[in-house]
Amino acid sequence: IVQADPAICGGYSEWKKIAAISTANNLKLAPHGGGNIGAHAVASLPQGLNVETYPGLRAAGAKVMKFFEIDEGDILLPNSPGLGLEIDWDAIK
């Protein structure tokens, strides 16, 4: 199982290159690190395995931004542009 982290391997574009190499070698992918970028990365792949999520971090982050929703273990990706992060600027102030 390949666990490249999109946040530290050079970004999403580099992660997709790693995914292509993994696909060519019939390897599963489970990106290291949770969050919206990992969820979108896994959703874009036929061999995507799972996405890490951290309930405590999600609860803390929920005070300033909206994350993807989880319903009975399934991630519900937003239809909004980009990664779907919505920052509550009033909460940050």
Spell out what each predicted region is.
Residues W89:
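Active-site and glycan-interaction determinants of carbohydrate-active enzymes
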